[in-house]
């Protein structure tokens, strides 16, 4: 989070940071409880704050006309990095220093760092919303906030301490709900009812058609489904199925599909192939309506749904030029 530069569209934007290799452990002869052991990992120009300032300036410069702003915070992704003065509010946590023997960078107070990184984003969003109000355009501005995937222990993230996933199974890189299920918040005064909620299930490929719908532009038919009707509590089209796959560098290949049966039950099928075992993996099946935390595999009870899941998995993808990312080795 202290890179040497950022990109603003096509413009290269230098930061006042010396290069810091992102994966280096604390030397084994260093004292992890000595603050001086971490001095070499510190930098000054925090990228998240630069992003926030750029967003604020953009809004000020475009407040007289409709605008689109995509603001992508990298935090709280590893490494654990935050300006020192923002740690103070969380230094009461009981801590074990993270020495980064596995990955990313060490930190003397990893729990405080992660909490402060999240609070930094919270503060930034608050500043953006306050500016919209000051400029008198908050009532005309739709704000959508979401994230990309579930939590991970990489880089010293303590998922158990923060209860990052609640009851959901899996983490980042898993295709269980804990890896891919993310809440999405939307605020649009006078258009979206405050405090309302929707059970509509969308995926990131629905964002572009939603934005196109807002702009009055027709999106290509292969780019998902607009969820604008769900935001406005109108009749919403739904996906007949949603498909995911993930290829781990450690030789694990995962597929998942979510679909409905004739009774409108929401099902989720997950298949994980491990190159090291070379076995034909079982497809797990979960009834997400009664088992949203994916605790009970009911694949043996519904063989017809397993066949349907296999067909959707095969039909939902095209071949990759990287052979390892195909699933030719699996029977239909």
Segments and roles (model prediction):
Residues 133, 232-239:
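Basic phosphate/pyrophosphate-binding loop/patch that engages nucleotide-derived ligands
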Residues 1-205, 212-222, 271-280, 289-295, ...:
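Active-site-proximal cap/lid insertion segments
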Residues 186, 209-213, 228-232, 255, ...:
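Generic alpha-helical structural context detector
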Residues 172-177, 243-249, 254-256:
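Short Gly/Pro-enriched turn/cap motifs at secondary-structure boundaries
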Residues 309-331:
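Charge-dense polyanion-binding interfaces
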Residues 58, 253-275:
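Short, surface-exposed beta-strand/loop micro-motifs that present aromatic residues
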